[in-house]
Amino acid sequence: MTTSVLELQNAALSLDGNAGRVKILHDINLTVAQGETLGLVGPSGSGKSSLLMLMGGLEQATGGKVAALGHDLTSMGEDELARFRRDTMGVVFQNFHLIPTMTALENVATPLELAGHKDAFQRAEAELEAVGLSHRRDHYPAQLSGGEQQRVALARASAPRPQILLADEPTGNLDETNGEAIVELLFGLRDKHGATLVLVTHSHSLARKCDRVVRLRDGRIADEAQREAAE
């Protein structure tokens, strides 16, 4: 029997905009299985990134239910949700989201320290080595290329040994060569941790690597396809 890692039931999201409350996602029903790699695709503004943020508890659903690993994220308080996300998920963003005043090593180690891991810096060093950046450990983000910054972000996402990996346009700001390297590392981290991977992408080649692709349009699921059909 396949275990569900992520489950959304009639999930909705509304956000405040200049013209008042705007509904971003409408009645999303979606289940992601353990070990599955799911791609979210669709035109700009279709709700892909918002759906990913909902799955990770980075946005709170304004309707319906969002569950991860059997836990109802919609019923958690802010502190409980932050702890749960920190312990179970790794998130990679298009714009890296590194702290500019911290070195590469500190960017990876600090979340582990905050989670109470006494071996935070040893684990961070191992993760930087795994992404080929141990020689840049003492450099600050401004001293790193875009590809190197995304490698730091991948190391940070991998460090807590997540059960769920979420990636929002992980190759969006990179050239083709760096993008291919990041994809290889991302899928390697998925395999290393036996994690479920959900990613947002505009890249057809990256979408074809996913087990299943869900296409969004105007905040709704328009269609979905398994890998064979997507190809």
Whereabouts are the PLM-identified features?
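ABC family nucleotide-binding domain
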Residues: 4-6, 11-209, 213-216
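ABC-family P-loop ATPase nucleotide-binding domain
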Residues: 1-14, 223-231
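Residue-level detector of flexible, active-site-proximal loop/helix-junction positions
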Residues: 80, 220, 228
